[in-house]
Amino acid sequence: MLNIVILDDYQDTVRKLQCAARLDGFNAKVYTNTVKGVGQLAVRLRDADVIVLIRERTPLSRQLIEKLPKLKLIAQVGKAGPHLDVQACTDHGIAVAEGVGSPVAPAELTWALIMACL
């Protein structure tokens, strides 16, 4: 069975989404807290086939990636940034999927907040 780990869901929203029912056929674990250090993360992620990152909250360094031999896919909510060692993923045959979005929405929100302050 595929082991899916969803990290850093601080507000416990993933399980409340309608699409969360799609995880029912998998061994999926959602973490609402965080751990620090490569050792603690390696223990938490040791059986993961798939890791879902909520934003850039948890860094996945080469040192950590090398401790996760079962890992096949990292899905990043939003754009993959410097918190994720993409080259290490490539070197270890781990696929990286990143979310894309419209750059317009953040710009619109910024202007709405500016105008609200006036």
Kindly label every feature range from the protein language model:
Residues 1-49, 54-55:
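N-terminal glycine-/charge-rich "phosphate-binding" loop or analogous flexible N-terminal tail
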Residues 50-118:
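Phosphate/diphosphate ligand-binding glycine-rich loop within oxidoreductases
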